[in-house]
Structures are given as C-alpha cells and as structure tokens.
Amino acid sequence: MGRFISISFGLLVVFLSLSGTGAKQDCLSDWSFYEGYCYKVFNEKKTWEDAEKFCNEQVNGGYLVSFRSSEEMDFVIRMTFPIFRFDFFWIGLRDFWRDCYWRWSDGVNLDYKAWSREPNCFVSKTTDNQWLRWNCNDPRYFVCKSRVSC
C-alpha cells in the first residue's frame, strides 16, 4: 500500500511539474507550450537572419519569438533566464523603416539615401521586459516560436 501511494504521489508530482512548465502533447517533446504556441530556447548564438532561418527549419511555421502580451513575455523570460543568465536574446522584431518612402520637409522625395549602418534588429533582456536595438550581424542566443500543430 505504501509503495502504491509513493508511486501515485510521484506521478502526481511529475504531472504537476510538466503542467507548470507548459509541456503539452501538441508541442514537440523539447518545446514548451503557452497559450496556443510552442517555444524553444536555443543555447547557441546566431545572427538575426540565421536564427530566423534556423527557426523556420526547426518546425513548419517556426520563427523568432514574438510577444502579444506582458504575460507571454514573462513566460519566455522565465525560460531564458536560467539558461542565458544576464544576457540578451534575439526576438522576431526588426525595424524595416529603411524600406519606407521618406520625404524631405520641402516636399521632395528621398531618392538619395545615406543611412548609417546602425542596428535595426531587436533583442530582449533576460532580466526584465525591455527590448533593445542591436546589430543584426552580432551573434546572439535566440528563442523560436510556432503555432501548436493540430
């Protein structure tokens, strides 16, 4: 009887710990579930474009993580901090402003462009919910996200 209670309690602990980490059968075994999406932290550094491509190759419809709420970001921060500690990781946000149509204050279209090569990709801190502009070619850690497969 004691052994049965131990095993039952052990299974309950495993079940509760898995539900707390977001494990769900709709995600691949090493991905975590949250609100209809699957997430995976990658402990390797890549440029923004290489990380985005890598996420696309990992799972159909995969991409660098995006956030739709502070709760979602908190979930990702809880996953990343133990791995990356006080570092930054790529997020899917990218500033595509260079592709917009700009006009000078005198009404003339901007045909000549002399933009500096300042960063136009974004990273997230692992310590709080802040994003920073970062050089896209700088290798960083990253998190992939995908919709739950039906």
Swiss-Prot record:
**Which family is this protein grouped under?**
Belongs to the snaclec family.
Record protein name field: Snaclec 7
Record SUPFAM superfamilies: C-type lectin-like
- Cite the record's note on assembly: Heterodimer; disulfide-linked.
Provide the protein's localization.
Secreted
State the PROSITE patterns in the record. Answer: C_TYPE_LECTIN_1, C_TYPE_LECTIN_2
Keywords for the protein's UniProt record, in alphabetical order: Disulfide bond, Hemostasis impairing toxin, Secreted, Signal, Toxin
What GO CC annotations are associated with the protein? extracellular region
**Which range is the signal sequence, renumbered to this chain?**
1-23
Q: Name one Pfam family in it.
A: Lectin_C
Function of this protein?
Interferes with one step of hemostasis (modulation of platelet aggregation, or coagulation cascade, for example).
Q: What does the record give under GO molecular function? A: toxin activity
Ranges where the C-type lectin domain occurs: 34-145
Q: Disulphide bridges in this chain?
A: 27-38, 55-144, 121-136
